[in-house]
Amino acid sequence: MPATFEFECKNLNIIPIKECNELYNKCKVGICMSASNPSRIPFEMMSAGLPVVELYKENNIYDLPDEGVLLAQPIPEAIASAIAYILDNPQVAEKMSKFGVQYMKNYPLEKGFEEYLKAVKDMLETDYKDIPEIKPLYKKSAFLATEEAMKCSEELQKAQPIYVDNHGKTYRFLRRCKRVLKNILIKMGIKKQ
């Protein structure tokens, strides 16, 4: 059964690599929000030459190079700031794009599998004494929210409610928007259920 969403989108399911690359090449910035475990999607995006914004979480700092991605503090304002920074700085986007393509030429999918298998083998066959410390690949600090993004967020929170007929199309649309935003904030750990 295909996934359903409360907002307009087109679920492409699994698409061939060529189509995936074409899709990424229609974008200016790739956004991935891996909050608990590493994702392969930022690597796909870098391979396609797409600058990437990801969350600054421990599960990402060991895998992702700081020249190809911006790891943002996991709050909406910082994520928006990182996206805006890339969009407002074409030279940064170009540099990230070129780095990502070059980096991924030396990082085939098999390399990731080999590294994973070696790590599992080391864990099973040793007493952990001779395993070298793994250092984060991403050495920058988290990309923080700009003052502009924080002010915008504050203004949005102060905004007066819009009153509409509670039986109309606009009301139903606004209710759906509110549910979607609430679910996003809950999933990001910003709002409690």
Language-model-derived ranges and their functions:
Residues 1-17:
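Conserved catalytic-core segment of nucleotide-activated headgroup transferases in glycan assembly
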Residues 21, 40-47, 61:
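Short alpha-helical segment that forms part of, or immediately flanks, the ligand-binding pocket
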Residues 22-37, 50:
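Acidic donor-binding loop of glycosyltransferase active sites
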Residues 40, 74, 107:
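Residue-level signal for the nucleotide or nucleotide-sugar donor/cofactor binding architecture
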Residues 51-57:
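Short hydrophobic beta-strand element within catalytic cores of glycosyltransferases
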Residues 77-88, 113-121:
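Two-component system phosphotransfer/interaction surface
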Residues 92-193:
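C-terminal amphipathic helix plus adjacent low-complexity
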